[in-house]
Amino acid sequence: MLVPRISQRAKLILSILSALLATLILFSSPGLGSNGKPDDETIRYKGQRLSIKWDPLTRAPLIIRGIESNLLEIKNFSKLSRKEITHTGPLLVNKYQSLLQIEPDQLQLKGAEKISDTWYVSYWQTFHGVILYESSLGFSIDPRGHIKSLGALLYPTVQAPVTSKISHEEALKIGQKQIKDYKKLKCMLLAESVLIYPVKKTNSIDYYRVYAFNFFPEKALHPATTEGGWAVFVDSQTGKVVLFEILMKPLGCCVPEDWVPPKPEEMKPKW
C-alpha cells in the first residue's frame, strides 16, 4: 500500500500541538502542595485576577489563566511577521516574571506555527544556554492578538554544572556500549546534544548535565519496519548512564510512494 509522505510542516504542527497539550492538560483536580499551599488558587497580580495551577514540587506555575482578562494583548497583531511573533514569549515572561521565576533570555524557541487564524508558540527553558530536558512554555494567540492562558513546565532554581568533565568522545563510547550488538546492528548516531536532565524525587530535584544520544539500527530507518532505537543520557561529570530508554516507532507497514532514506538531520531527537 502506498501513501503520501507527511510533510515537514505537518510534523512541526503536530510537535507544537503535542507540547501545548502536554503542558495545558495537567492535574485536573485541586490539591495541596508540598509546602501546604493549594496547587490551584486565584490571585490578584498587579491588579489582574489570575487562576494558577502550581507544580507541587517546583512551585512554578503549570497553568496561568486570566480571569475576565487576557494575559497579553498584542497591538497590530495581524501585521506582525513570524519572527516578531516569536518575540512574544520573552514579553510574556517579563510581565509575569515573579510568578514564572525565570528570566526572559532563558527561553529558546521550540516552534511557532499558524493553524487557521491562530498562532501556536512554544519554547524550551535554558540554563546557561543549555536546554532543560522536557521543559516548555507554550501558548496560543488568537486572531485579535490575545493570549488567554499559558502552560509551562519550568524549573526556577536549577543547580547544575556549567561545564563537562568528561569528553564527548568518552561519553559517546559509553553510550554505544549500552547497546548490545551495536556494530552487528549497524547502529547510527542520528541525534545528539548537551542537555540539563532534571530527575524529580519526592521532595527534591537532581540536575544532571548530560550528553544525550539517540541511536538507531540501520533497518529502523525504513518506514515499513517498527524497529525502534535507543536514547542514552550520559552524565558529563561522572560518565554514569542516567537514562537508557527504548525509542518506539508508530505501528504501521505503509511505504510512501516517494520514500527515500532520511538524512540524520531529518530524524526527530528525543528532547
Which role fits each region the language model picked out?
Residues L32-W271:
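Segments that shape or occlude catalytic/ligand-binding pockets
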